[in-house]
């Protein structure tokens, strides 16, 4: 039996957006929205050249032509192919930059539908899948056009302020799509009357012409410019296993395990990151390493007399200071990616008659986290001190037993004002934790009222009561986090633990 489907089409989208913003003063939230303005705040804003009003316009245009064909034979062999031709005004003005043809081919072999599998009753499903193609995406934050903005000159007196047009971004007429060749191979298995289901996918992507803001010589008037500056390789796999060990009229137990692995490597990069770009909490991009790699300044102990930390600086010398703007990264230590390499979850559902219990765990591993900065050269009575200071250096000889630096006196602190050793300590190998965790995500208990009871009412068709709790227990996390949550963090470090939530739900169907 042959099955052939074809479709062709055109897609056109446009969007015109206008943005207005203004700052209002004197709005009293606690007094019903009454406005009370002190004229001195307006005077200060005008004299400070503060723009309290702004507006902007954007015009997006997008067009695509596509064709897709699917062919299947006897539900055993399935082939598919797609061709697209996309264009947008968000990219460079050159035609070769704005317009791009992409394609994809895929095939599937349903082995379980073959005639030689008819006698194999314990195999319910067995199929192989594969696809390969060229894909493309558009970086929504990038713009190829020159950007001019209207600003006021910075003048001390109001009658001297003038309106000027400032160049904010340079044009890049050759800015084009981010592209990638993607290979995907998969297998689907169902065994023993679907008591065991396995889905496995392996994928590999070679990305090129990736877009980012690239530092340049500033000859054109701006220091940064959007450009296609990098190539990257990424690969991984996704595994899903479903098992039903018990399946009877009154008893049922179903278990589902999911596991994903992803790794990346930048194979070509035109950027020149500084030390700070690579050691901050959000990670940096460096050729030969994963996207979002976290590096650290190498910590080399504490000074015997002062307890001030020592490091290997940008020149390879052990010293108190490190120049964060240096582009020599040879002496940094690679910690790992900030994004987890392994992610997954494990769900178990137990049912006895009309009562069911679900337990869901999540986990991740393979990433590193920069701990939030906690050390300064000097402190005051207003500073909140971390408990880590209980283990700080306090007298000569303590450097043999602790890696926590001292709180120095005023004279010693004055000598380090231009060196910032404590800031370097915040970004050293001592201030890194593993992002691995295992979490009891949810537990829910549901009771469904039996159908024969509901039939007596002649009104209700379904009634169930559910009691659930989420974020109940962080089973494992790195002790260096001191209770902070490794799953949710940003450029400022890690977030506080998620709050536990409990819900009761009553569902009634008529």
PLM feature segments, named:
Residues 80, 321-325, 420-421:
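Short, positively charged
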Residues 167-168, 329, 340-341, 425:
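Flexible glycine/proline-enriched surface loops and loop-helix/loop-strand junctions
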Residues 88, 364-464, 482:
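Extracytoplasmic gating/loop element in the C-terminal half of outer-membrane beta-barrel translocons
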Residues 256, 330, 340-354, 441-446, ...:
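Conserved SET/PR-domain catalytic core that frames the SAM/AdoMet-binding pocket
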Residues 335-372:
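Glycine-rich, aromatic-lined ligand/substrate-binding cores of catalytic
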Residues 15, 20-23, 28, 227-230, ...:
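Conserved small-residue
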Residues 1-289, 427-510:
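Extracellular/periplasmic, surface-exposed regions of secreted and cell-surface proteins
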